């Protein structure tokens, strides 16, 4: 049995444990009184704050129950926000405004037992950062840098999320044959460490108020090495342990949903593990992988498939890192996740259930400590839900998806722009997308006064139960096939995603899935935006090629030595990331990719 099979057993065992605690609370008077006293104490110590109109509200909303069995069901089955099994949130206060007027003390007495293996849970209060993180990347590094400064001009914390162009995603240099017209299209062109310096110019990379997220997987270790090299150029080597951020680096989802993989699967996983081994030891604030369901969802999966494949991929990575000898409490806290949020009913509780399954699986199948149990989540509203027909409706779609994302207590969120069916978003529509989050979190009172404002309804509970059961069924099928890697090689996830995508399109075609303005309530008018499509001017593309040529000429001898050393380390089977760091100082992305492919080969895309 693989670890995934153990996770299924762990969740089933924990659910039985919860039922046992419910029965015990009803039959054991002493235990029942202890639970009632703990519940009453928590409620009594919950601060009371006031809305702008003066209405008093508890800072933590709890169900009004006094029956010991139901208290046990809540404390053990759900947990308070920030407590195992984290159904209601990774941290205690998430999006709440800083405390101003408090009439009572702070809540926080933890349950005396969190399951069959008692461990203190939680990770302290959440850092005071805005959860908004907008995705951006266009033309050359300096153009994206300008957009970054525009997006963060009103934010206390600078949380940048970077999109790369096609050549960069495939590890190809801008001067490669057939690439010229694709430079800077749909993302930023990054060929060298010098580009990386330009990309984040003006930001203090070592500041606790800065973090960078880089959406790239195939050449992720190379891009990560360039980011470290750029940081060292600007701030010196002592900045490395201070760097905060995420690189996506999710090879499994690439093979399952995208095909943006440049090395064979086993080699890709080896390079990833080399990077994780280095960063978890040397960069304690960095997340070296973002286990991503977003692309799985955008490729056409059902919500349950998205969550199941993402979680199973995560457990497979954890098993792989542990096999390398990396301690679970070293890599566990540095794993992060990325999910899509659409409009189907499953999204009401998809992330909540995922958080619970991850916590139980990591604790009971991997023996992870409290910090390694946390499902730290970035959510993005659904790009697939945005359509060109009557495109202004996309504002409402995204607003509804934002509501669902924050109901699930996501740690950070990107809201898509309404004009994305046509082009790389313009500043006008990006501003509206960002303001959508600000209105929800800062202007409205839905999330800023009270934790658990919208959780716990009978409908949400029904969705949670159904989604968890469906995810475990997906786990069982993957386990039957021999685990995640075997299923990937058998194209199982990919074929299931393709089948789901076909059903989705068929439902739109036959009208069983209504899309307002497309197959229902059409007004017949063309309201396409009158905006200029985002294109990289040829002179900018030529500038990128010229810069790259100059860099290669300047570093020709050093690059040869560094690349020879890198190849030697790879052939000896050692951790190649330190050698990759040296190569990133003097070699281009394409040069490094090319030499590594000479050693390990190329990935054959799956269809």
Regions found by a protein language model. Give the residues of each.
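Flexible, glycine-rich loop/tail regions that form catalytic "lids" or insertion modules at the edges
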Residues: 1-113, 126-138, 142-149, 157-166, ...
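Catalytic alpha/beta active-site cores
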Residues: 5, 9-12, 16-347, 365-378, ...
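Generic secondary-structure signature for well-ordered alpha-helical cores
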Residues: 16, 156, 201-205, 232-236, ...
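Short hydrophobic/aromatic segments of transmembrane alpha-helices and their interfaces
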Residues: 178-180, 299, 394-395, 442, ...
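Residue-level marker of motif borders
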Residues: 180, 187-189, 403, 451, ...
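Active-site capping/gating regions of soluble enzymes
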Residues: 308-314, 336-517
């Amino acid at each position: 049995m693989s670890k995934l099979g153990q996770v299924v057993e762990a969740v089933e065992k924990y659910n039985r444990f919860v039922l046992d605690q419910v029965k015990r609370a009803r039959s054991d008077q002493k235990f029942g009184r202890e639970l009632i006293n703990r519940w009453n104490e928590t409620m009594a110590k919950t601060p009371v704050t006031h809305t702008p109109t003066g209405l008093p509200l508890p800072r933590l909303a709890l169900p009004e129950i006094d029956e010991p069995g139901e208290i046990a069901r809540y404390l053990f089955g759900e947990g308070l926000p920030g407590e195992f099994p984290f159904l209601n949130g990774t941290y205690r206060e998430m999006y709440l405004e800083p405390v101003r007027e408090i009439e009572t003390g702070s809540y926080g007495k933890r349950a005396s037992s969190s399951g069959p293996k008692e461990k203190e849970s939680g990770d302290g209060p959440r850092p005071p950062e805005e959860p908004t993180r907008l995705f951006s990347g266009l033309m050359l590094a300096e153009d994206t840098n300008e957009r970054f400064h525009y997006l963060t001009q009103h934010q206390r914390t600078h949380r940048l999320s970077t999109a790369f162009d096609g050549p960069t995603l495939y590890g190809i240099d801008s001067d490669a044959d057939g690439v010229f017209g694709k430079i800077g299209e749909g993302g930023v062109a990054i060929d060298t460490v010098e580009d990386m310096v330009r990309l984040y110019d003006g930001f203090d990379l070592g500041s606790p108020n800065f973090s960078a997220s880089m959406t790239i997987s195939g050449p992720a270790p190379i891009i990560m090495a360039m980011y470290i090299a750029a940081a060292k150029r600007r701030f010196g080597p002592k900045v490395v342990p201070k760097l905060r951020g995420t690189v996506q680096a999710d090879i499994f989802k690439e093979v399952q949903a995208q095909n943006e993989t440049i090395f064979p699967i086993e080699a890709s996983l080896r390079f990833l593990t080399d990077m994780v081994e280095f960063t978890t030891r040397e960069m304690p604030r960095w997340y070296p992988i973002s286990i991503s369901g977003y692309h799985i969802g955008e490729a056409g999966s059902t919500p349950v498939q998205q969550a199941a494949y993402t979680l199973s991929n995560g457990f497979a990575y954890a098993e792989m890192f542990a096999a390398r000898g990396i301690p679970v409490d070293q890599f566990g806290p540095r794993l992060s996740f990325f999910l899509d949020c659409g409009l189907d009913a499953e999204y009401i509780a998809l992330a909540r259930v995922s958080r619970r399954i991850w916590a139980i699986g990591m604790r009971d199948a991997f023996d992870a400590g409290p910090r390694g149990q946390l499902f730290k989540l970035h959510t993005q509203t659904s790009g697939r839900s945005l359509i060109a027909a009557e495109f202004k409706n996309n504002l409402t779609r995204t607003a509804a998806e934002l509501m669902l994302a924050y109901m699930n207590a996501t740690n950070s969120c990107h809201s898509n722009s309404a004009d994305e069916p046509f082009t790389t978003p313009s500043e006008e529509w990006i501003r509206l997308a960002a303001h959508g989050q600000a209105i929800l979190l800062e202007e409205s009172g839905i999330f800023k006064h009270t934790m658990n404002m919208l959780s716990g309804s009978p409908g949400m509970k029904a969705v949670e139960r159904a989604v968890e059961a469906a995810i475990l069924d997906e786990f069982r099928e993957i386990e039957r096939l021999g685990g995640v890697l075997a299923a990937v090689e058998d194209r199982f996830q990919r074929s299931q995603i393709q089948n789901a995508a076909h059903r989705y399109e068929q439902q739109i075609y036959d009208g069983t899935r209504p899309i307002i303005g497309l197959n229902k309530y059409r007004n017949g008018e063309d309201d396409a935006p009158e905006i200029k499509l985002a294109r990289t001017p040829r002179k900018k593309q030529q500038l990128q090629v010229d810069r790259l040529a100059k860099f290669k000429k300047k570093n020709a001898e050093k690059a040869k030595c560094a690349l020879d050393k890198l190849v030697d380390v790879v052939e000896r089977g050692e951790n190649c990331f330190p050698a990759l760091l040296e190569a990133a100082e003097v070699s281009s992305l394409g040069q490094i990719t090319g030499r590594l492919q000479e050693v390990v080969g190329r990935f054959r895309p799956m269809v």
